[in-house]
């Protein structure tokens, strides 16, 4: 009589999240062991220092082997070498591509090239983030950029599809890629008060409204050389923005626009007199920013110009955010009552995004 046995062999790869964090943060095995000892793990587990050293080294070896798969996350899901539950795979990917705000703030808008990579030593010293971690984060930004730069369609969707990131992290990477592609200036002293979140918020608005993808029309010819849908600003839209100059060049239109805004806001703004006195300067600033966006340098200086032409003047007159919101809403809407103005749709596409950005940028 024979018996049949079904044998299953399991070899689940164990992932210690704390050790993974130390590895991601760029600590050597020696430093990681020291930090684990300091956390009290020996007392908690009754392990010896030698066992802790061996455990840490084993984890580091596993992470090094996993790293090549993390460079192309779908490969991690389909490989058979490491038996890792799906929830653990998602954690490994998400944390590998996570970044430090202090680091991304230093490289945001810069070209993701060898030249910038040479500055990582200085960035590491300035931020206190280990050089190894800086390199990982920079290489991640560059890798995502290279994969999606030639793709059509939604930037966020492309990033999620190829890197399996959460929606929030994919949106952050879309902002990083968008800023790197358009080279927006973010490093000037007057912009240092702005966080990555501020810039990412504005990037999302611009991607939704100012890029070729925002037009919502993909090329019918598959061989078309149309610019990347969500990566590049719509150049035709930027050229058309020069038409808005009539709002400040035509004295009658400017006076009527001011009259409409002042009539609507009288008694509603705490800074009404300041707004009335500065209306023309503020309007010229906002319209001239639009008219200059035909030049690459002025596109790069967009945030510098917005802070100089609008945020700083309002801040110096102590406008509360609520008054800024009231003003921008009425300033935008009143243009629809100007009979001599014929570019309403263009104005709405410009100011709809600019209004959201300015409200986000207006803080201490």
From Swiss-Prot:
Positions of modified residues (N-acetylthreonine): 2
Task performed by this protein: May be involved in mitogenic function of FGF1. May mediate with IER2 FGF-signaling in the establishment of laterality in the embryo.
Keyword Cell cycle among UniProt keywords: no
Origin: domain of life: Eukaryota
Expressing tissues: Highly expressed in heart, skeletal muscle and pancreas. Expressed at lower levels in brain. Also found in placenta, liver and kidney.
Membrane topology summary: Peripheral membrane protein
Alphabetical keyword list: Acetylation, Disease variant, Membrane, Nucleus
Organism: Homo sapiens (Human)
UniProt protein name: Acidic fibroblast growth factor intracellular-binding protein
Annotated Gene Ontology cellular component terms: endomembrane system; membrane; mitochondrion; nuclear speck; nucleus
UniProt GO molecular function: fibroblast growth factor binding
InterPro entries for this protein: FIBP
Disease listed for this protein: Thauvin-Robinet-Faivre syndrome: A rare autosomal recessive syndrome characterized by generalized overgrowth, developmental delay, learning disabilities, and variable congenital abnormalities including congenital heart defects, renal dysplasia, and skeletal defects.
Localization: Nucleus; Endomembrane system
Entry's Gene Ontology BP terms: fibroblast growth factor receptor signaling pathway; platelet aggregation
Subunit comment: Binds to internalized FGF1; this interaction is increased in the presence of CSNKB, suggesting a possible cooperative interaction between CSNKB and FIBP in binding to FGF1.
Predominant subcellular localization, coarse grouping: nucleus
């Amino acid at each position: 009589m024979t018996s049949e046995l079904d044998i299953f062999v399991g070899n689940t790869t164990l992932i210690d999240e704390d050790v993974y964090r130390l590895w991601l943060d760029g600590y050597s095995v020696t430093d990681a062991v020291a930090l684990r000892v300091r956390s009290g793990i020996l007392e908690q587990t009754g392990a010896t220092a030698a066992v802790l050293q061996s455990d840490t080294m084993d984890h580091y070896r596993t992470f090094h082997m996993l790293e090549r798969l993390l460079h192309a996350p779908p490969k991690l899901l389909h490989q058979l070498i490491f038996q890792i539950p799906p929830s653990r795979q998602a954690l490994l990917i998400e944390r590998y591509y996570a970044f430090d705000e202090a680091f991304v703030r230093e490289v945001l808008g810069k070209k993701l090239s060898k030249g910038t990579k040479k500055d990582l030593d200085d960035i590491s010293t300035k931020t206190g983030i280990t050089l190894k971690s800086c390199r990982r984060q920079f290489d991640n930004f560059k890798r995502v950029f290279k994969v999606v730069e030639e793709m059509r369609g939604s930037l966020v969707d492309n990033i999620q599809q190829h890197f399996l990131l959460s929606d929030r992290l994919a949106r952050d990477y879309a902002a990083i890629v968008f800023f790197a592609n358009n080279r927006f200036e973010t490093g000037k002293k007057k912009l240092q008060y702005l966080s990555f979140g501020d810039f990412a918020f504005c990037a999302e608005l611009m991607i939704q409204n100012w890029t070729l993808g925002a037009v919502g029309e993909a090329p019918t010819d598959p061989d078309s050389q149309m610019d990347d849908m969500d990566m590049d600003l719509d150049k035709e839209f930027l050229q058309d923005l020069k038409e808005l100059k009539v709002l400040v060049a035509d004295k009658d239109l400017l006076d009527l626009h001011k009259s409409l805004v002042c009539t609507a806001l009288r008694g509603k703004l705490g800074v009404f007199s300041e707004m009335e006195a500065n209306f023309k300067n503020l309007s010229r600033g906002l319209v001239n920013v639009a008219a200059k966006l035909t030049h690459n340098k002025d596109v790069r200086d967009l945030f510098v110009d917005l802070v100089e032409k609008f945020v700083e003047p309002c801040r110096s007159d102590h406008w509360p955010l609520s008054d800024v919101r009231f003003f921008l809403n009425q300033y935008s809407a009143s243009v629809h009552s100007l009979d001599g103005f014929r570019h309403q749709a263009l104005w709405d596409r410009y100011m709809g995004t600019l209004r959201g950005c300015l409200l986000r940028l207006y803080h201490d």
